[in-house]
Amino acid sequence: MAELIIVYFSSKSNNTHRFVQKLGLPAQRIPVDNRPLEVSTHYLLIVPTYAAGGSDAKGAVPKQVIRFLNNPNNRKHCKGVISSGNTNFGDTFALAGPIISQKLQVPLLHQFELLGTATDVKKVQAIFARLKHHTHDKQKQTNNLITERTHPCHKPMRHTSH
């Protein structure tokens, strides 16, 4: 199978961290401090939303996530985004997901509230499995194309009668 991991950001409250732990999937956390993180494999991004609510979308995407995604290598490996939020904030609920989805041109795969429910966990696990399988199939097709290009095709031998 092609490698796929979860990359996520969680503040010191650890709400997103606890959700990711429930998934039981390979994961890498974007540091809260300014330490850089570079990934070299495909990933799903799980990100909380930090918006004030109403029409105030400023600051919806955490600065650490912006810094992480400013790295072109990190951007190219993102296969989709999942966001969390608080429905008390109305229109800005889980807004970080749609913002990142639009900027990176990747699918918004799921949105959940706060720590997520057991149903959210199952949905994200299913999304991960489906995407991992899809990524594996695409990698297999790419490998076949590469194999076809790098290995010359031998012409069949002609049989001649004596």
Swiss-Prot record:
InterPro entries the UniProt entry points to: Flavoprotein-like_sf, RNR_Ib_NrdI_bac, RNR_NrdI
Question: GO molecular function terms here?
Answer: FMN binding
GO term, biological process aspect, one: protein modification process
Return the Pfam families for the record.
Answer: Flavodoxin_NdrI (PF07972)
Q: What does this protein do?
A: Probably involved in ribonucleotide reductase function.
In the record, the note on similarity to other proteins reads: Belongs to the NrdI family.
Q: Which HAMAP family match?
A: NrdI (MF_00128)
Q: What is this protein called?
A: Protein NrdI
The record lists the organism as: Streptococcus pyogenes serotype M5 (strain Manfredo)
